[in-house]
Amino acid sequence: MKNGLTRVFTIFFFLVLSFSLNFAQVEELENSSQDMLIKSEVETAVSMLRAIFVKHEAGEMSLEEAKKLGADLLRELKYGEDGYFWADTEEGVNVVLYGRKDVEGKNRLEAKDEHGTFFIKELLAAGAKDGGGYVEYWFTKKGKSIAEAKRSYVLLFKPFGWVVGTGYYR
């Protein structure tokens, strides 16, 4: 009897362990897929900014006109159900933040998330790296009052001095 119970317990233990590992792998795979999506979306947005900058270089518009056109583009550019973009200058001044025109033009460098992280500083640092980077922080979703865990990808568009990003809530 004792030997049978030991076997049942051992099998049960390994089934639970196997399920837990598989669940973690599925979650990791989902996050990896989301990471690839947001990186691709930011790279696409930056390539659109690059096309605008090329028009500036060709003398078709001033740098200020190109930046305004770029900001207007990012403000309206969406993907999926609720994907949007934002941009901050390398100094932390917000250029575009979806649904938050009240923030545009304001320096967000000292902004902290719910855990005391200077998330704008981290986003700017990650964006300045060659190839951009990912940052995890807490942010309040539009229409909500409680901050949620968020993972973002950011990339510097050097000609405008903007760090462009998007992210997903975990």
Can you name each region flagged by the protein language model?
Residues M1-R170:
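N-terminal membrane-sensor/transducer module of prokaryotic signaling receptors
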